[in-house]
Amino acid sequence: MSSDGRRRARDFSAGGVVVDGDQVVVIVPVKRAADGRSVLGLPKGHPDGDETPEEAARREVAEEAGVTGELIDELGEVRYNYERRGRTVAKRVRFYLFRYVSGNVADHDHEIEDARWMPIEQASRDLTYAGEREMVRRAMSRSPPDR
């Protein structure tokens, strides 16, 4: 419940942190932040139908970043609130760590302005949202060595 007694809406998404050595895939969605600025973030989105969160994260990585990855580990959840049509929405995003397997970041979908590789240390500082920066830091500590 919110402070005014109304039931709070809930929203869930799943996302991926895709690493290749010391690089991580980041995206710039076409959709801007509430203040109009562009966002530097991680691929994520809602599960389709009966998809598991892991399946949704894998699909979103492929669609939004143009790459595929091998699932390594669950990194955790980011939780935050946002406003939609005058209601507070409690959002949860579960992130997974993937090791890059194939694909090209130039093959991202139309919802994404840009997808690119970035040094993981830089991403841990430069991503727009603190929760996503934390997921990258967790990935840094859990990333397996290169094959």
Give short role names for the model-derived ranges.
Residues 62, 66-103:
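Active-site segment of metal-dependent pyrophosphate-handling enzymes
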Residues 41, 90, 117:
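Short aromatic/basic micro-patch
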Residues 42-75:
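The catalytic Nudix box helix
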Residues 2-42:
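N-terminal strand-loop-strand
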Residues 19-24, 32-34, 48-49, 77-80, ...:
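Short, charged/polar surface micro-motifs in flexible loops or helix N-caps
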Residues 102, 106-137:
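NUDIX/MutT-family hydrolases
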Residues 17, 26, 95-97, 117:
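Conserved hydrophobic/aromatic beta-strand scaffold that supports enzyme active sites
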